[in-house]
């Protein structure tokens, strides 16, 4: 089995890129799900001042923790408006695990995506080169044979003309000698033409095995690549699918701990540190009210985010690659070694003139062997 030839320098650069992206992905965090909702608090403060506090929250779930981006709009009865935006990170589990499982899965997803896309241009280039080389070599030999044939014909014509001139200038030869000379010249011409055809047969004999060997090498290397890529895509598909289920399950646990989606009520209070909350309240959310109850919880919605779409793209790419590779393996099994010479012309995709010349050459070859 023949392996694909890969330049060591290019392979080293590719491995460095993969390692760099893997390391970089550990510093990146892509949310899998996002939740948007609004909380409106009506609070009575001293001097009978009513404060309407609207909290616009966006929770981005990362599997083991989430990130709260909230925006406050406060409006008092004296038409005093305030707008405050804060970003708060809240860990529903142990803080030591929040940067491990999720970022490993993210790194695996990014690395697998690049590793699956990068070899595709290499296969296309190799396929084009391997298919074009034998065709060009064969056409060049046919063109060279045509040039040699034309040169031989010109030489023969010149020799015939010289012989005819010599025969015409020689008054001592009789008609019988002239006839003999003409017959000899014709025999010589026929012998020359036979030599040309023998050379054409040598072109076919030398060219077709070369093309056959190159096609066998290409098919062997392509088969090795296809089978290897099929195994890689299959394993990557299973790992990505498993990791997606794991992350989704962790997100659902986080949602159940914090909220009741059906009732749209948060079950667990979020206690932020005093550094983030200047008032130091352990409220359901950061707020400026003195109560822990939320009178209105509305516009709740949550759905997939960038990390989930990244996993989905990886799964779709794996599925598409597996289907295409299986199709190529099935169709490649039909590309057996040609038994008849004319089948090579279908693979070479020659022009009509080259096809006619090739058939004439193979016909002369069969006549010569018979």
UniProtKB/Swiss-Prot annotation:
Keywords: Membrane, Transmembrane, Transmembrane helix. Residues 145-197 are annotated as: Disordered. The keyword tRNA-binding does not apply. It is found in: Membrane. Signal peptide: none annotated. It is a multi-pass membrane protein. The chain crosses the membrane at residues 11-31, 104-124, 227-247, 310-330. One of its GO terms (cellular component) is membrane. The keyword Lyase does not apply. Residues 147-194 have a biased composition (Low complexity). Its main location: membrane. This is Putative uncharacterized transmembrane protein DDB_G0285049. It comes from Dictyostelium discoideum.
């Amino acid at each position: 089995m023949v392996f694909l030839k890969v330049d060591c320098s290019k392979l080293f650069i590719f491995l460095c890129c993969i390692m760099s992206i893997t390391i970089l992905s550990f510093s990146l965090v892509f949310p899998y799900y996002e939740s948007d909702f609004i909380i409106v608090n009506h609070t009575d403060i001293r001097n009978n001042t009513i404060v309407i506090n609207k909290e616009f929250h966006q929770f981005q779930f990362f599997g083991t923790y989430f990130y709260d981006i909230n925006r406050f709009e406060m409006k008092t009865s004296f038409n005093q408006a305030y707008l405050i935006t804060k970003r708060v990170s809240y860990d529903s589990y142990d803080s030591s695990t929040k940067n491990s499982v999720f970022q490993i899965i993210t790194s695996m997803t990014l690395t697998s995506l690049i590793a699956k896309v990068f070899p595709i241009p290499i296969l296309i280039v190799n396929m084009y080169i391997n298919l074009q080389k034998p065709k060009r070599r064969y056409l060049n030999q046919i063109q060279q044979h045509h040039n040699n044939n034309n040169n031989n014909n010109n030489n023969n014509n010149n020799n015939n003309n010289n012989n005819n001139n010599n025969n015409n200038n020689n008054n001592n030869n009789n008609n019988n000698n002239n006839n003999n000379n003409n017959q000899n010249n014709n025999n010589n011409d026929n012998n020359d033409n036979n030599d040309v055809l023998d050379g054409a047969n040598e072109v076919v004999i030398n060219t077709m095995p070369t093309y056959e060997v190159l096609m066998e090498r290409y098919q062997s290397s392509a088969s090795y690549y296809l089978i290897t890529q099929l195994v890689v895509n299959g394993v990557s598909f299973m790992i990505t699918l498993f990791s997606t289920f794991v992350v989704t399950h962790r997100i659902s646990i986080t949602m159940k701990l914090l909220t009741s989606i059906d009732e749209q009520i948060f079950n667990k209070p979020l206690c932020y540190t005093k550094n983030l909350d200047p008032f130091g309240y352990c409220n359901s959310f950061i707020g400026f009210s003195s109560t822990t109850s939320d009178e209105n919880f509305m516009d709740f919605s949550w759905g997939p985010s960038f990390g989930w779409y990244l996993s989905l793209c990886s799964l779709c790419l794996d599925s598409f690659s597996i289907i295409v590779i299986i199709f190529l393996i099935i169709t490649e099994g039909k590309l057996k070694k040609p038994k008849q010479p004319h089948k090579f012309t279908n693979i070479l995709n020659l022009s009509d003139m080259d096809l006619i010349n090739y058939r004439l050459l193979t016909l002369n070859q069969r006549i010569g062997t018979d």
